[in-house]
Design a protein with these regions (language model features):
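Small-residue-enriched alpha-helical segments and adjacent helix-cap loops
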Residues: 2-3, 19-168, 172-182, 186, ...
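Intrinsic, low-complexity N-terminal interaction/targeting segments
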Residues: 3-18
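Short beta-strand/turn micro-motifs at beta-sheet edges
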Residues: 12-16, 238-243, 311-312
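Short flanking/linker segments adjacent to small metal-binding domains or redox-active Cys/His motifs
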Residues: 128-129, 389-409
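An acidic, glycine-/histidine-flanked metal-binding catalytic module
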Residues: 158-235, 382, 389-393, 408-409
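Active-site cores of enzymes that catalyze phosphoryl transfer or operate on phosphate-rich substrates
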Residues: 230-250
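Short microdomains enriched in Cys/His and/or Lys/Arg
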Residues: 347, 377-389
Length: 409
């Protein structure tokens, strides 16, 4: 592998990003799942070649921090050797699918959800004509069941609706029927073609649909809109997730601030062996789902997870506050986001807050009720928006921001 080139946005396994704590790389497990052996491989490689910190991203990828220059190549080799990445860097970069978390486990989900997601990912990866897709362009395959993929911010959503698969570009109110991966590839190609003709080229599908309308995009893709598609809500991804007759299910474990140590990942793998089916399913909500858990064993699993510092209770107050890594790991950050987020937790605010180190908003895809945006060592407040939106108030210390939030709207 040639020497790394610094990136400022969306790292991958073969295109690391320089951060304040070393190089940052992403691992995209095939099918969105880790076997116990693969989890141990990632944990071991993160400890050996990085600083042992692993994050779970909003696209259900793993992000490993703190790699030294000399560790980038060996880390990538370990991940490829474990079957967790395509050895071709260009194909790996085009693997852009958020997989249905409980495919093959939840009987209420579409039976072919995992197969279709894999086919779509292979088709995107195998099409060199899609090399110019923006780094954040993502497809979500939602097979229904207990863990739907609502609120992922994906550019194309492929969903199981009333007994058939529909594909909808973000911002559209309807979808085209999907028989195989071809419809999704057509939408991706149409995005490139149509956005390339715009004076100010949109970087996301929602912006393009907002500019030209979904009918024009479907026409460019040579697809027919056949049915309405209602956006699905973000599911409850933490705690006991029953399926079938309720005697078995999955258990969702959240990561505080989406971060864990290599030792914690190994601990989750041990839990999956002891109580589940041995697989760790990644979700886009900074949580992992462990399928194959007996309902009677769920309390023991939750207790073990709590001892590891994981979020096992849907009412855990740590779920309400999210934060990017901030100055501790990002040179672009203007504030120590996670330390300040911990201060918010101690105050027990009854509102969901995202703390962003800067206006890029890497740590939060969707809008939040409140976003605190770092600016020159202080904070701006964005309500019902994203970090890149204009703050209604600027120049606040964290204490001042907390005071305003405690005072109410």
């Amino acid at each position: 592998m040639s020497g790394p080139a610094a990136k400022g946005w969306c790292p991958s396994l073969f295109a690391p990003m320089r951060a304040a704590d070393g190089w940052l790389v992403r691992v995209k497990p095939p099918g969105g799942a880790l076997s116990v052996a693969c989890a141990k491989c990632v944990a071991g490689a993160a400890e050996r070649f990085g600083n042992g910190t692993i994050e779970l991203t909003s696209r259900a990828n793993l992000q490993v921090r703190g790699l030294a220059d000399e560790g980038i190549g060996p880390f990538a080799a370990a991940i490829v050797g474990a079957g967790l990445a395509d050895p071709d860097p260009e194909r790996e970069a085009r693997r852009r699918v958020i997989h249905p978390p409980l495919a093959g486990a939840d009987p209420a989900a579409a039976r072919d959800a995992g197969r279709l997601a894999a086919e779509i990912e292979a088709a995107l990866a195998g099409d060199p004509g899609l090399a110019d897709l923006p780094a954040k362009f993502t497809v979500a395959v939602d097979g229904g069941g207990g863990l739907t993929l609502g609120g992922t911010g994906a550019d194309v959503v492929v969903a199981w609706v009333d007994g058939r698969w529909l594909a909808a570009p973000a911002g559209a109110d309807g979808g085209a029927e999907v028989a195989d991966a071809e419809a999704v590839v057509r939408l991706a190609r149409a995005f490139l073609e149509v956005s390339g003709r715009c004076a100010a080229r949109p970087r996301r599908m929602r912006a393009l649909v907002g500019a030209i309308g979904s009918a024009a995009l479907f026409a460019a893709a040579e697809l027919d809109r056949v049915a309405e598609m209602e956006p699905r809500a973000k599911p409850q991804a933490i705690g006991w997730l029953a399926y079938g007759d309720g005697r078995r299910g999955a258990f969702g474990l959240g990561l505080p601030f989406g971060t864990m140590s290599a030792a914690t990942l190994a601990g989750i793998a041990a839990i999956a062996v002891e109580w589940g089916d041995g697989s760790l399913r990644l979700t886009p909500w900074r949580a992992m789902a462990l399928p194959g858990v007996e309902a009677a064993e769920a309390p023991a699993l939750a207790a073990k997870a709590a001892r590891l510092g994981l979020i096992a209770d849907p009412s855990d107050p740590r779920r309400a506050v999210t934060a990017c890594i901030g100055r501790a790991g990002c040179a672009a950050a203007a504030v120590d986001a996670r330390a300040d987020a911990a201060m918010l937790l101690r105050r027990g605010l009854k509102i969901a807050v995202h703390v962003s180190g800067c206006s890029k908003g890497c740590g939060q895809v969707e809008a939040a009720p409140v976003t605190l945006v770092g600016e020159d060592g202080r904070y701006g407040i964005v309500r019902d928006g994203r970090a890149g939106d204009a703050p209604s108030v600027r120049g606040l210390t964290m204490a001042e921001a907390i005071g305003l939030l405690e005072a109410g709207p």
